[in-house]
Amino acid sequence: MRIIKFEPKYRDDLIFMILEAKNALGRVPGLNEDLLDIQQNYFDKGDMFWIAIDDNDRVIGSVGYNSIPNSNDVVLHRLFVKNNLKNQGIGTALLKTAEEHLISIGKKAAVVHLGNKEHFYESWQFYPKHGYVEFEPNYMRKELFKSMK
């Protein structure tokens, strides 16, 4: 597996992977419109989006972020791992890639919106293992500058 900056040639495979991951969680797989134009919704704003690629050049995971205006914080988006490859460190590697990048550009905190605990139980288990704490209902946050000590 390798983690790379998103490239347009992977768009359809990324969308398919995310829809498949949502379906596996028992959710009606809807398309998030930001995924239709990663360039405009992430890169053109100065933000980033990464994908995990397997040995067959297929998308097996993703994560991106958008900066919160007038702050040094970001909101993480679209951290997904292909359903049959969960619990193999792919999500952790994607999150670490994003956090290391954020620290390198001076961001202070990452925020994630999780939704309710009943429907998003995997996320509610994953993020606390990586230092995220709930600070508002359905939101978790990690102070990035503290995490590198």
Give residue spans per PLM region.
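Conserved active-site alpha-helix within GNAT-family acetyltransferase domains
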Residues: 92, 108, 116-136
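Conserved GNAT acetyl-CoA-binding A-motif
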Residues: 95, 102-115
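Acetyl-CoA-dependent GNAT
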Residues: 5-77, 82, 95, 101, ...
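Short coil/turn motifs at secondary-structure junctions
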Residues: 68-70, 81-84, 117-119, 147
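Extreme N-terminal starter segment of soluble prokaryotic enzymes
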Residues: 1-2
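Conserved beta-strand-loop-alpha-helix junction that forms the acyl-donor binding cleft
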Residues: 86, 111-123, 141, 145
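Accessory recognition modules or surfaces
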Residues: 64, 88, 126-129, 145-149
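Conserved acetyl-CoA-binding loop-helix of GNAT-fold acetyltransferases
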Residues: 81, 87-100, 125, 129
